[in-house]
Each structure stands twice: as structure tokens, then as C-alpha cells.
């Protein structure tokens, strides 16, 4: 039985990759990689995201300057159609991921009751 759970997980992984929303996000990411300006903006977004996660892990908040930089980056992303398309595709895919997470972790939540 324990092997079955891994088989199910692998089937689920393949099913997620087969979703139109996943393929759309993947295509959008490839378009970003092909565009130098969009790629640089995406890399900047990832760096800022990592920095924010580091701050959160240490219980710190971004400074006012960092908040202003984040706001400026957000505006640049909103103005870039490739990035906007990618994040919209990611959002559509996250609906599935959130639902799957809720379903998979339901038994663990039951243990806490």
C-alpha cells in the first residue's frame, strides 16, 4: 500500500503538468526568458522575493526604502505584458495547487482535531 501512495503522487504530478494552465504558465515563462528586459525584471522580482522571505524568517519588516522599491518593481511588472501574463497564468494554476493541497492535507488536519 505504501508504494501506491507514491504512484498516486507521480500520477498527480503528471496530471498537473498536463493542465492547460500549467502549459500556459510554462509558455509564458519561456517568452520571458526570450525577452531580455522581461527576463531582467523577472530576475529582479525573484531577488526581491528572496530578500523579503529572509526578512520574514528573521521577524524583520522591510524598510520604507525597500517598500518603495517593491512598489516601483510592482508597477514595472504590471506594465510588462509578458510578466503580467506569466503571473496571471501562475494565479490560474495556483487554484488547482491550493485545492490539491487542501485535499491531500485533510487527513493531517483530522489528526489535530
From Swiss-Prot:
SUPFAM superfamilies linked to this entry: YheA/YmcA-like
Top-level taxon of origin: Bacteria
Gene3D superfamilies: YheA/YmcA-like
Family statement drawn from the similarity comment of this UniProt entry: Belongs to the UPF0342 family.
Protein name as catalogued: UPF0342 protein Sez_0866
Organism annotation: Streptococcus equi subsp. zooepidemicus (strain MGCS10565)
Amino acid at each position: 500500500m505504501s508504494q501506491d501512495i507514491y504512484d498516486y503522487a507521480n500520477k498527480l504530478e503528471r496530471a498537473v503538468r498536463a493542465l492547460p494552465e500549467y502549459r500556459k504558465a510554462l509558455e509564458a515563462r519561456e517568452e520571458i526568458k526570450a525577452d531580455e528586459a522581461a527576463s531582467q525584471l523577472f530576475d529582479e522580482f525573484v531577488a526581491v522575493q528572496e530578500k523579503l522571505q529572509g526578512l520574514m524568517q528573521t521577524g524583520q519588516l522591510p524598510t520604507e526604502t525597500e517598500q518603495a522599491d517593491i512598489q516601483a518593481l510592482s508597477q514595472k511588472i504590471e506594465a510588462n505584458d509578458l510578466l503580467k501574463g506569466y503571473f496571471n497564468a501562475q494565479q490560474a494554476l495556483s487554484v488547482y495547487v491550493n485545492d490539491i493541497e487542501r485535499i491531500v492535507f485533510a487527513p493531517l488536519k483530522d489528526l489535530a482535531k
